[in-house]
Amino acid sequence: GNECIGCTMKLYGNEDAGISRAHTCCSLDDVEDARSVAHRLGMPYYVFNFSDDFRATVIDKFVDSYLHGMTPNPCIDCNRYMKFGKLYERAKILGCDHIATGHYARIEYRDGKYLLKKAVDPSKDQSYVLYAMTQDELAHTLFPLGGMCKTETRRVADEGGLINADKP
């Protein structure tokens, strides 16, 4: 076991308040679900407001690239600058040695190097949006879902009594 904290990155305003969660992601309901899961697991839970950084480093870049005829993938920049940039820095300030995310990918240490590997479940693999991770980031990241299929993830969550076991 590890000593864990839970967190959500607030990346934009709450314009989705009152909208069905089927039509949005990262809604206020999702934040409350995450808080409930953290509480059930006995972990402290935080919401980190990175909305200004997200707009400047992900959204504005995406819009500019799109306007110049490119087809950008904002997930790559979000992972690079937000999860493994801002969140990793905040985690270090809080005394965390690692961050763990729900990405379906794996990390292997071999011959003195960390290798980013595809998830066991090829239909859920997300390693392609993590290609920009540095050796330091890989050394301090855990992908606990990478060795599981989605059905197994749901089963474990259900057995743990987590309210989000059936969430899409």
Regions found by a protein language model. Give the residues of each.
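Anionic-ligand-binding alpha/beta catalytic cores of soluble enzymes and soluble regulatory domains
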Residues: 154-168
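ATP-dependent adenylation/nucleotidyltransferase module used to activate substrates
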Residues: 1-132, 142, 151-153
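Adenine nucleotide phosphate-binding catalytic loops in nucleotide-utilizing enzymes
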Residues: 146-147
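His/Asp/Glu-rich metal-coordinating catalytic cores
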Residues: 134-137
